Swiss-Prot record:
DNA-dependent RNA polymerase (RNAP) catalyzes the transcription of DNA into RNA using the four ribonucleoside triphosphates as substrates. Forms part of the jaw domain. Keywords: Cytoplasm, DNA-binding, DNA-directed RNA polymerase, Nucleotidyltransferase, Transcription, Transferase. One of its GO terms (molecular function) is DNA-directed RNA polymerase activity. It catalyses: RNA(n) + a ribonucleoside 5'-triphosphate = RNA(n+1) + diphosphate. The gene is rpo1C. This is DNA-directed RNA polymerase subunit Rpo1C. Its EC number is 2.7.7.6.
Amino acid sequence: MQMADLEKKLENSVLPPLLRRELSEKILKENINEEYIVDEIIQETIRAYSRTVIEPGEAVGVIAAQSIGEPGTQMTMRTFHYAGVAELNVTLGLPRMIEIVDARKEPSTPTMSIYLRGDYKYDRESAAIVSKNIESTTVESVSEDISVDLVNECITIVLDVQQLESRQLTVNNVVEAIKSKMKLKIEENENILSLKIKTPSLKALRKRLPKVREIHLKGVPNIKRVIIRKEIDEYVLYSEGSNLKEVFEIDGVDTTKTTTNNIVEIQDVLGVEAARNAIIREMDATLGNQGLTVDKRHLMMVADLMTTDGVVKPIGRHGIGGEKASVLARAAFEETVKHLYSASMRGYVDDLSGVVENIIVGKPISMGTGCINVCIKKEYEEGKEL
């Protein structure tokens, strides 16, 4: 039996496309050619799929909230070292869960898992070269001392020669970088640089000191540190800080597997569908690290809700909770007086189509048996026998 024949048999079935393809591949792999057996397998798969589909009118939102919220009460409140990488501090537990559903623009501990391609992933020295190209190098990171010299009225930088060599930089590279960022007169004396300004004063020199320290020399901005770790048969880089777009441009990086824990950044670089997958993955990993198991479909429900408008929105008064169509539903969530006052001024009408607003006014909700209308047959009304 060919793939085209199987696709024709399955094209009008209730099975989703991914399941159809997987089923077709499995039938071909097992080399099942008898048509009656293939038909029986398809029918059994459809029956099994139908049993897993949720009943119409089921309160899936409440079930998802309970299923995520209840294990959430058992999660740790602390931030501690990530089990896999002892050198990196990563937010885990409840604080991380809150970060995800709040769609924070910047996580408290941004980090990246950078996978390598080709020969880079099997050779530690090659992986170290990539890590050096990624790790952000500033003037401070290649200096032994940066201070204000009151006697000579200048900023003195004592460069660390070993650090410069290990990062493949020269004193001239540092001088050029400083000149491109600041208007200063620079005097060189081997590894000591004296930075002078036109009108020197203690206040002016101290004001420039932090800027001099942060001047970028090499690598990807925002990536403070990169560590190399052996994962089964390949080397993987873990970074402190995140910059997905620029890391993708580094030679040797596998762009198909590299990821970050910054969901908003994933949306900006790879789009909303990738952000949805990241929300599911991050929530699942956060719960999994605590030894908690939640059905993925509950997490998918939350991710779908957060990304349904094409951008990642938080679950709260500044996102989904504050954008509900119903005035009463918005008022019931947070900022009650503000919503009621605003609605009465503008003359809004609530059509009571949701759950919360119907509960407020004491009407049956449109869920479960409440979403079914009972009709009387015409024959029964006319007194005819049924």
